[in-house]
Amino acid sequence: MAAVILVFGVLHASPAQAAPTPVYPISGYFIYGSTSDANNLKKLTDIKSVGGDTVITFGSLLKPATLSTIPAGCTISGANCAKAAAAGVSVNRYFTYSDNSSWGSPALLCGRDKTLTNGTTRYTILLLPSEGSGCSSPSNTYDVVVITGGQSSISISLGKIATELGMKYYAGLPAPVKRTDITYLPDLSYQATFSLFTARFLLYQDKVNDVPGLAGFYHHTEMPLSNGAVWDAVLKVYEIQNSRIAQYQPTRSALVSPYIDSRSAFSGKVTVDQAREAVRNIADTADGVDLAIAVQDGMGTGKGAAFFGSESGNSVDQYAAAIVGSGTWGGKYLAPSRDYFAAMAEGVEGTGVELWANLEGMAPATSQNPCDNSLRGQTTKSRMDKQLQQLGNTPRKVISFMWDPYFTCSGTYAPMLERLKTTSNTPVITDSIFYGNGDVLVTGHNLSGGTIQVKWTDAYGRVFDKTVTATSYNATYGKQVGINPLLESVTAKLGSTSLGSGKNYFINVTNGSGVKNDALYSDRG
């Protein structure tokens, strides 16, 4: 696998370069936004201080409703606002929506749309034609959406602050509710209304949030990386919304984050081959939109595993054991996340879609790692380093679920934010090539200015352990070969030797700051 990803190994001879200031190589985070500019400025500034340049928020549900469930405060001349706004037309269905945005006058597009304020609450009523297009229904039948908002908006504030800080923000898209019979699938019984409402959402964002910091939109509806036909309903949601983005926000991109579940004993487990096909299916929904697929690595939920082949017989750690029970990595999981990401890189090849990684920044909860009141717990820096190296060189960008609370909570450990500030210079080895001339190209992060230790077995069965000075440091390796631009490279010159076929070799890097990688790295000849 390494040889496929590192085909540009000749770049190991690039002139030595100065190392960039260390920052942790996670460059984006899911967050909970605020309507307060000050709160958002503090949060995004903290994220930027540890290398983040991107933030993502979740979407909200477009919920079917009845007249009796319309907010009581939404009245027109004392009458239910949905009923009053629909006077003189037939109503197909009612819906409610709330995403902590103000909506109001900028969202009004058609003559029957209305907005009103009751105290600090702003209501916006949209009448969406059940038939036809535009503002009018040939049958005079409409769907009524009542939006509840306030005097300020999370999305507008985050767009503003992201722009000021030179960062990128992905706003969460509306999502359908789940079905009542199959509760993990979206309810597509109102997909036409959902499509129209997505269009109105995008038009509203274009009017109030047309700033450089708004990079695009996040698909709130989630699915596993399964190629089963049952998940076609989720793909349909992606198709609907990507087509609307292409239509109304063509200069902005989209982001989706499916998840790996490689637990051997789980009935819904997904093989590497299925993941390759599934990510291709998601890519095929892009409809011309610049789409990134940020796959969750599963380490925070116990659904995925970070281990090398040389570790397959080792016991799972205490956090994974809380989910899958005692056993070995190779026994409890079908394959390591490294194999999944390599396959998914093949799956998106030629589609124009980017493969990202969503590194889960928490761990399964035990009594030893509480994190506020979350159902997940704090993780360790070394565990995250292991997750990072397992991603290899395939993801174009690494983001993380999620900033709050997992990077900010105190518990057994200090907040991860503080730990990242003090340990961001730890080497992380993501991949390598062992060349026939005895040179070993090592890629990763924080690799400059030190030594490389390589343990290997040659073609004659002789075992070697050699430490050499790291040479040919290339701070822009990732940029030069068109992969993750944060990736660096160094070379270990071992002299004339060979690598035994099928034999594991091991690499450690101690950088110029005297810091050694804290996660085992191995590969096979």
Indicate where each model-derived feature is located.
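Short, acidic/polar
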Residues: 34-47, 195-207, 270-282, 376-390
